[in-house]
């Protein structure tokens, strides 16, 4: 069974988002070994942080992210400059990896400051959930639902209309 990880910076604090993610995580269990890895957000003491302070925090988060990726996994970074993909595109990406025999995948959601360039460079794909700005907890919920939707598309189920 294919391993799919969601690596995210920060905790799910909002109960309603966490419940939604938990529901789709449970549903995904029938299609893949789905795992969520939550890494701590590097705290910046100064509310008016400089670009340098933010870059340093992103670098530390990036190191933690890259250390958490399974060896040989296909890394997908969610970022603003990523390619906008449809549910069918995501399903094809997952199916292609599963068929290749090296099916492990890791999807990464960064902190409110985004992702370090080292993660973007290491990623084999960069995708975007769209041009709108989403809170990171909501982005995790949307991504988890889309992963479930992609798996149902690949299984020929009627969930996707």
Predicted regions mapped to residue ranges:
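N-terminal beta1-alpha1 ligand-phosphate binding loop
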Residues: 1-28
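Conserved RecA-like P-loop NTPase ATPase core
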Residues: 6, 76, 110, 143
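General small-molecule cofactor/ligand-binding pocket signal
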Residues: 7, 35-37
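Short glycine-rich anion-binding loops that position phosphate/pyrophosphate groups of nucleotides
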Residues: 12, 80-83, 111-114
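Short, well-ordered alpha-helix to beta-strand connector turns
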Residues: 32, 72-73, 123
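Conserved beta-strand scaffold positions in the cores of enzyme catalytic domains, especially
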Residues: 36, 75-77, 126
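S-adenosyl-L-methionine/SAH cofactor-binding core of RNA-modifying enzymes
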Residues: 40-105
């Amino acid at each position: 069974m294919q391993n799919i990880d969601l690596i995210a910076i920060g905790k799910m604090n909002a109960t309603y988002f966490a419940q939604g993610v938990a529901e789709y995580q449970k549903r995904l269990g029938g299609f893949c070994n789905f795992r969520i890895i939550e890494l701590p957000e590097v705290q910046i003491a100064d509310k008016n942080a400089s670009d340098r302070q933010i870059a340093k925090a992103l670098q530390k988060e990036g190191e933690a992210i890259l250390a958490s990726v399974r060896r040989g996994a296909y890394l997908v970074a969610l970022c603003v400059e990523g390619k906008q993909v449809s549910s069918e595109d995501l399903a094809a990406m997952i199916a292609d990896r599963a068929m290749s025999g090296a099916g492990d995948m890791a999807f990464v959601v960064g902190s409110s400051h985004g992702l370090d360039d080292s993660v973007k460079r290491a990623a084999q794909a960069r995708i975007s959930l769209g041009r709108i700005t989403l809170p990171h907890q909501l982005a995790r919920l949307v991504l988890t639902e889309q992963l479930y939707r992609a798996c149902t598309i690949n299984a020929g189920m009627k969930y996707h209309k």
